[in-house]
Swiss-Prot record:
Mast cell degranulating peptide with high potency of histamine release (EC(50)=0.26 uM on rat mast cells). and high hemolytic activity (23% sheep erythrocytes lysis at 50 mM). Its mast cell degranulation activity may be related to the activation of G-protein coupled receptors in mast cells as well as interaction with other proteins located in cell endosomal membranes in the mast cells. Coiled coil: none annotated. One of its GO terms (molecular function) is toxin activity. Keywords: Amidation, Cytolysis, G-protein coupled receptor impairing toxin, Mast cell degranulation, Membrane, Secreted, Target cell membrane, Target membrane, Toxin. Belongs to the MCD family. Mastoparan subfamily. This is Polistes-mastoparan-R2. Pfam families: Mastoparan (PF08249). It is found in: Secreted; Target cell membrane. It comes from Polistes rothneyi.
Length: 14
């Protein structure tokens, strides 16, 4: 998992 994927996930959750 890369940073962009993590950022997208965080944005979806938050």
């Amino acid at each position: 998992l890369n940073f962009k994927a993590l950022a997208a996930l965080a944005k979806k959750i938050l």
